[in-house]
A protein has these predicted regions:
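Negatively charged, low-complexity tracts enriched in Asp/Glu with abundant Ser/Thr
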Residues: 1-32
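Short acidic DE-rich linear segments
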Residues: 117-121
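Acidic, low-complexity, intrinsically disordered interaction modules
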Residues: 34-111
Length: 121
């Protein structure tokens, strides 16, 4: 068994909260494999390429990946080439603002925001 029924249900719940973002992102694809479960595939559309695939181990793992992607969007938007834990106060405020709708629906995963900002995981 790839995931317990409870684990798969929780992954599906996180997937649903981030559904629009998952559909629209040009940077990754979330795929299902009968052999390994959910796979986070790093891709590019311009130029077209497929990079690395990482198995999603848990709902927290998927939520972390999605929240990290939201934060990276802000850093790309500002044109600053630095790590998330080095974000300036304006970037941090925008990242937290963009995280809020997701964390409001997934409050059990709010701790991941702190982990991301502290460079953990």
């Amino acid at each position: 068994m790839l995931y317990t029924e409870k684990e798969k249900h929780e992954i599906e719940r996180v997937k649903e909260v981030f559904a629009e973002r998952l559909r629209q992102s040009p940077d990754f694809e979330l795929l299902w494999s009968d052999k390994v479960g959910y796979v986070w595939l790093t891709i590019g559309v311009n130029p077209l390429y497929v990079d690395t695939g990482i198995r999603i181990e848990s709902a927290a793992d998927l939520c972390y990946k999605c929240l990290d992607d939201v934060a990276m969007d802000v850093l790309y938007m500002t044109g600053n080439d630095h790590a998330l834990e080095e974000a300036d106060p304006l970037e941090l405020a925008e990242i937290k603002r963009r995280w809020e709708p997701y964390i409001n629906q997934l409050p059990d995963y709010a701790y991941l925001c702190k982990d991301l900002l502290n460079g953990k995981m």
